[in-house]
């Protein structure tokens, strides 16, 4: 179909649509990620039991996409809308939501809301799905409730939205090795991703601390490799262990179910099988994969980098090829992640086989041996119709010909790869690392470092300025990374990931210039959606963040900020509780020894967050 349909509809509506409602203030539109173009007008479209959804016959992917709207309506409103698969022109005079194939790009959509109808144009199932996600965000936040909500008018503000993504790859990562998470939680994780138009789930499945994927040819990987005998308590340096065996793995049946679930939400799952480092759990099961320099190997019980890595010998390559053969049966993704990071070379330096191989191949050193290792695996993976992506370190010793780079060590690796005309996903720490503190460490749970605040993540530009226009084309996307050393529960994952992932999602989708103030206003509404989805996000958005900067031996300079829009910060210096009568923060000030800075955010005369303090 072509764009003739909306024009015909417009002509018909001149006759059929009348202003039957009194004028009213337009609802504020708060969509995350921000659409490329949005224009709001007066009026609303009301959804009720008489509303129908009209789709073109035979388009099963679009029918599945609009089913997500009905699923939400059934839970929150108590009813769903009839879906009419027919020629929409035959129903031009009826009240409804018209979902039309207008030949747009795959993920693009065009949404027009008028008082008499809604038209959602797309170029296929993905565009229709993303249009539905935006449509849901135009409705009252109660649409995300799991139980029926009474007394709500299910109204869409009249508007015109044209939208398409900035990047093809919009990713979110989850490490399920350092801590294990159930399939039910992963489905919820994917649901929240999909709401934000995030379309890649990078699933970290193998590590030193546990192997999480069933491989039928190598049953010990899950019979033994899933387990570690105990886990370090607290930080890496604590020296204390809990003495409790820890394990968990995903059966192939569970994986297939999750892959299907994700695909229905236009999320592609990219599995990560680490090589040649971070392999201790596998080596503990099959010691012949190592260089054989130790008498005993066991799955790691603490975090960090371990010297036990895969030995580049035929037994190892046969093992890895067998593993990937089963991986390819489970994951239809063209991309597979091969890790490639943090591979110590100590074993290879001592290993007679490795040294002989370096000499035989005419390699310069162990770094080039790692490059050869990865290139050999890339050839096999390419032969099976797949492509590899790996962390920055795959650049060391020479980049495999067809490899994509996931830049995590700052921007340098991404810049270098893009300049070599290799595609890059930007996932730099600390900018996109969600295991870092997001607020004052004094009031936050244990984390890897930081802080990396919501604002820092929002304002980061994932396309480095040093790249030329041509080189910038090789930046294909972004990813937020969730490493779970200090996230033992689903609740902690949600707390660390959201709402910061909202900022990363917007950087991945939205092309336009950034506006922090506008983002926070949209986000405040959006948090109501996350509340109703039972997402346990961090509420530091409402809390003052106090920082003390060096001044003199006897004084420091205090700065205070808060993310919540239109909030005043009130503070005290004498240890008393700040109230609306306390001084308003207007800029940096001097703090002397033995003073306590206490601060709270207040809006419209009411406290909106927690009181925070900092002692000097």
What are the language-model segments listed below?
Residues 388-393, 398-403, 409-557:
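Flexible, acidic glycine-rich loops studded with aromatic residues
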Residues 1-29:
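Bacterial Sec-dependent N-terminal signal peptides
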Residues 104-335, 376, 380, 479-483:
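Feature activates predominantly on carbohydrate-active enzymes
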Residues 20-167, 492, 507-520, 524-533:
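Contiguous, structured surface segment used for ligand recognition
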Residues 205-209, 217, 273-279, 342-344, ...:
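Active-site-proximal loop/turn and secondary-structure-junction residues that shape catalytic pockets
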Residues 31, 54, 63, 520-616:
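Short, compositionally stereotyped local motifs that mark structural "simplifiers"
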Residues 282-288, 299-301, 305-401, 408-416:
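Active-site neighborhood of glycoside hydrolase catalytic domains
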């Amino acid at each position: 179909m072509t764009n003739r349909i909306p024009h015909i509809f417009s002509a018909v509506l001149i006759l059929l649509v009348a202003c039957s409602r009194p004028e009213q203030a337009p609802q504020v539109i708060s969509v995350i990620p921000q659409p490329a173009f949005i224009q709001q007008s007066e009026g609303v479209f009301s959804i009720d039991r008489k509303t129908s959804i009209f789709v073109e016959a035979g388009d099963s992917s679009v029918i599945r996409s609009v089913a997500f709207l009905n699923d939400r309506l059934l839970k929150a409103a108590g009813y769903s809308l009839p879906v009419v698969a027919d020629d929409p022109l035959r129903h031009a005079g009826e009240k409804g939501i018209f979902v039309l194939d207008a030949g747009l790009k795959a993920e693009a959509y065009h949404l027009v809301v008028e008082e008499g109808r809604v038209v959602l144009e797309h170029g296929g199932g993905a565009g229709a799905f993303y249009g539905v996600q935006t449509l849901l965000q135009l409705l009252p936040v109660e649409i995300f409730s799991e139980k029926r909500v009474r007394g709500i008018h299910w109204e869409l503000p009249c508007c015109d939205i044209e939208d398409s993504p900035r990047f093809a790859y919009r990713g979110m990562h989850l490490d399920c090795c350092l801590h294990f998470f159930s399939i039910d939680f992963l489905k919820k994780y994917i649901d929240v991703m999909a709401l934000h138009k995030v379309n890649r789930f990078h699933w970290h499945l193998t590590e030193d601390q546990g192997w999480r994927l069933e491989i039928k040819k190598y049953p010990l990987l899950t019979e033994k490799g899933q387990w570690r005998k105990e886990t370090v308590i607290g930080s890496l340096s604590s020296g204390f262990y809990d003495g409790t065996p820890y394990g968990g793995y995903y059966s192939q049946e569970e994986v297939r179910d999750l892959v299907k679930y994700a695909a229905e939400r236009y999320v592609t799952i990219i599995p990560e099988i680490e090589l040649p480092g971070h392999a201790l759990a596998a080596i503990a099961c099959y010691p012949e994969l190592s260089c054989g320099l130790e008498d005993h190997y066991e799955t790691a019980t603490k975090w960090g980098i371990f010297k036990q890595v895969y030995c580049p010998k035929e037994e190892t390559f046969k093992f890895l090829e067998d593993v990937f053969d089963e991986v390819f049966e489970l994951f239809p993704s063209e991309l597979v992640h091969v890790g490639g990071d943090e591979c110590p070379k100590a074993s290879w330096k001592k290993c007679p086989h490795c040294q002989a191989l370096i000499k035989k191949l005419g390699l310069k050193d162990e770094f080039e041996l790692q490059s050869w290792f990865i290139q050999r695996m890339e050839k096999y993976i390419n032969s099976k119709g797949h492509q590899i992506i790996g962390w920055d370190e795959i650049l060391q010793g020479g980049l495999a010909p067809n490899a994509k780079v996931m830049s995590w060590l700052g921007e340098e690796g991404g810049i270098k790869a893009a300049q070599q005309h290799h595609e890059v996903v930007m996932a730099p720490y600390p900018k996109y690392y969600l295991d870092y503190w997001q607020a004052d460490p004094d009031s936050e749970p244990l984390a890897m470092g930081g802080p990396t605040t919501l604002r820092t993540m929002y304002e980061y530009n994932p396309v480095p300025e040093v790249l030329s226009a041509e080189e910038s084309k090789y930046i294909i996307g972004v990813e937020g990374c969730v490493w779970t050393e200090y996230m033992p529960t689903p609740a902690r994952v949600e707390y660390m990931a959201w709402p910061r992932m909202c900022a990363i999602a917007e950087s991945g989708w939205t092309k336009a210039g950034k506006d922090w103030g506008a983002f926070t206003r949209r986000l405040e509404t959006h948090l109501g959606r996350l509340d109703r989805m039972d997402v346990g996000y961090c509420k530091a958005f409402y809390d003052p963040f106090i920082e003390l900067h060096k001044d003199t031996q006897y004084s420091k300079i205090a700065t205070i900020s808060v993310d919540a829009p239109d909030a005043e910060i009130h503070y005290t210096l004498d240890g008393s509780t700040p109230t609306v009568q306390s001084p308003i923060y207007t800029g940096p000030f001097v703090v002397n020894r033995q003073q306590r800075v206490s601060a709270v955010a207040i809006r419209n005369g009411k406290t909106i967050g927690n009181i925070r303090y900092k002692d000097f």
